[in-house]
Amino acid sequence: MTAAELKASILDLAIRGKLVAQDPDDEPASELLARIAEEKAELIKEKKIKKSKPLDPIVEDEIPFEIPDEWVWCRLGNVCMSIQYGYNAPAKPEGRIMMVRISDIQNGVVCWDGVPYCEIKESDIPDYLLRPNDILFARTGGTVGKSYIVDVVPHEAIYAGYLIRTRYSADVCAKYFEASGISVGRFRSLLRRKAL
């Protein structure tokens, strides 16, 4: 078995809940999802995020494998506070607000020296401003599903139109998505099926 095959095997066991024994003291996933739904409802009420379309429940045909009883199958939209396409504007060599493009992300890192600027209305900036824990996904072309977890934003920056930003509750660790290999295969197939 190669190192890559071993890594894939360990990841597969982990996402199925078979790598370690389940701790009965861990909070059930259903409780976390309920807290996220409450937080989302409050943000909608405060007009900080927009209400999204209701998501279809997971049906039997969509379940690829069994998971521990404390876990729950859900849609990405159930754990995200928001899912939003990026801002469409031409790149500029100078300006105040940087615009991260998929080509600026290499090996999981933004190459900030090459990130261009863009013109954006002041009133639109808060909707597109990147924050730590956001995850960006490429939504078109040969890089569909390529992802980047925003760790640090050294300059005010938004994200370009060919990217999708997912934003999470503080109760959700974006690093989990990276560890689960969401940018590899799984998310790519979700995007292709438009199952978000």
Task: Give the positions of each predicted feature.
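Sequence-specific dsDNA recognition surfaces
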Residues: 57-62, 77-89, 103-132, 150
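Non-catalytic DNA-recognition/assembly elements of restriction-modification systems
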Residues: 9, 13, 18-20, 60-85
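Specificity-determining recognition surfaces
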Residues: 181-196
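Phosphate/adenylate-binding "loop-and-lid" substructures adjacent to NTP/NAD/dNTP-binding pockets
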Residues: 26-66
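Amphipathic alpha-helical coiled-coil/heptad-repeat segments
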Residues: 1-36, 42
